[in-house]
């Protein structure tokens, strides 16, 4: 049986909130089988638990934001991406602010945290959502689509028409049957444009944004002294985000994801469109490990992880 996973021990870190600029303490704890990923705002007078779910995503303008009863947890996508990449099904996430710390702008710090805690299999079958027919959402020339595929594959195209971005790869495809999430995706950093950062700061946002946690571009070039971690880091980060956005559905997807200029909002619309069509998906488990897609096999976990 292909089993669910959680972490072996509690781990904790402190980072900066991208928008508040304040110190945020993040604690990751093991969770029982069939719990899912549960975020808890421990700073509130009465702690609020928010289960990761497509229906719990509210604001998607700047990040994926989980909301419940007026409580928010923002910028969950990088941590969710790391959980997907390492095959973590169940996890308690305690946070003492309304946003997950930005760390270095990638998922690498979260991968390190999870790996430091260790992985533990649980006595319950890992549940997948298998896409049975294509589902697509569009907005002008933007699109996001899920298609039937026995595995997990993503293809993303960006089009920013910026000199520093244009000279890098604009399209990236990854099939986790033979590729490592940790090696090929996890270290790709978020990016933004200097004029947008200034506009956000005037609105009281992006106070924690810096060259230490994002690739920042002016009208012509990259402002960071550090070189790109990948030759096509921009589009790889969009895939990192997409993996996290999709994992909010609560289970690994057995599917192919194709996107052109998609973002957090469109990714969430895609999940909602999938769930709205009961003929488009089914829940599956694998009693025999060897019958599962290669990307999710324990012996191949380093390939996805």
From Swiss-Prot:
EC number: 3.5.1.108
Gene Ontology CC terms: membrane
Entry keyword Lipid metabolism: yes
Transmembrane portions of the chain: none
Biological processes per GO annotation: lipid A biosynthetic process
Binding, Zn(2+): 78, 237, 241
Record key words, sorted: Hydrolase, Lipid A biosynthesis, Lipid biosynthesis, Lipid metabolism, Metal-binding, Zinc
Zinc among keywords: yes
Reactions listed under catalytic activity: a UDP-3-O-[(3R)-3-hydroxyacyl]-N-acetyl-alpha-D-glucosamine + H2O = a UDP-3-O-[(3R)-3-hydroxyacyl]-alpha-D-glucosamine + acetate
Pathway noted in the entry: Glycolipid biosynthesis; lipid IV(A) biosynthesis; lipid IV(A) from (3R)-3-hydroxytetradecanoyl-[acyl-carrier-protein] and UDP-N-acetyl-alpha-D-glucosamine: step 2/6
Role: Catalyzes the hydrolysis of UDP-3-O-myristoyl-N-acetylglucosamine to form UDP-3-O-myristoylglucosamine and acetate, the committed step in lipid A biosynthesis.
Family: Belongs to the LpxC family.
Entry protein name: UDP-3-O-acyl-N-acetylglucosamine deacetylase
Organism: Cupriavidus metallidurans (strain ATCC 43123 / DSM 2839 / NBRC 102507 / CH34) (Ralstonia metallidurans)
The organism's taxonomic lineage, starting at the top: Bacteria, Pseudomonadati, Pseudomonadota, Betaproteobacteria, Burkholderiales
Gene: lpxC
